Amino acid sequence: MVIPGVCICSHCEFHDRASLTDRPGWLRLYGAESLNSHFTQSLLGCRQQSFYMEAETKVEFQPENFKQMAGLAYYYNTQCYYYLHITWDDQFGRILSIIKNDLGKGSYPIGMGVSIPEKGPVWLKLTTRKETAQFSYA
């Protein structure tokens, strides 16, 4: 799969988990297993090549339950990552939350997250400065 201006992935086999044609101008990823999975994740990744970097994406996602998530991950492996994601909370509706996975132990460093509008896109951003990583959204 080739994503213009982003990266070339000649060895990737997305099959039915990703599409550049279902919605022209957008990359659509279809859900699979969690970031903890060693098998079928729906994940597009690029290697961090500098201590100073920014990654930003626009996400349109309307989850129907708490098991559905989409977002931006700072990912080392299945046991070590931070994941800023849109999901669903039965009390607050659509929310933005962070999962921290440290050596396989998951936690929610900002609690249950923050409410966001029920519909519409959300911009997610990751900024790193040496040993510091910061997520932001708009």
Question: What is each stretch, according to the model?
Answer:
Residues M1-A138:
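Extracellular glycan-recognition regions
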